[in-house]
Amino acid sequence: GIKGAQATAAAMFLARTGSSKADIRTYVEREFGYDLSRSCDEIRPDYHHVESCQETVPQAITAFLESSDFEDALRTAVSLGGDSDTLAAITGSIAEAFYGVPEDLKAECRRRLTPELEALLLAWEARAA
């Protein structure tokens, strides 16, 4: 739990402050002891639904490290299988910090919100700004 949250937060911070993917990988491996040496192609064949940070966070970070943009990061995370919504949430948080979210994707997501949820999102964005 806590170790996974700390590793994710550290990766997000490093991504947001301009660190390279290589630097993010090195930091996470060194500080949290996660093995990020397996590629997504190596993870995919035997990955299954796991609720443990030790078997979710490293895979999510690897999906980010192998990605070329925000959408690719999410698609790569989901393609691993297993607990794909959790993987995509972790990967997406790091990818957003590194790449940003394309405006067309933001617009499409907003279009799908109910008016109540859109108002809540706008209020949160105003408060976070």
Where are these predicted regions, by residue range?
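Short, structured coil/loop segments at alpha-helix boundaries
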Residues: 1-2, 29-37, 54, 102, ...
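Double-stranded RNA-binding/processing signature
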Residues: 17
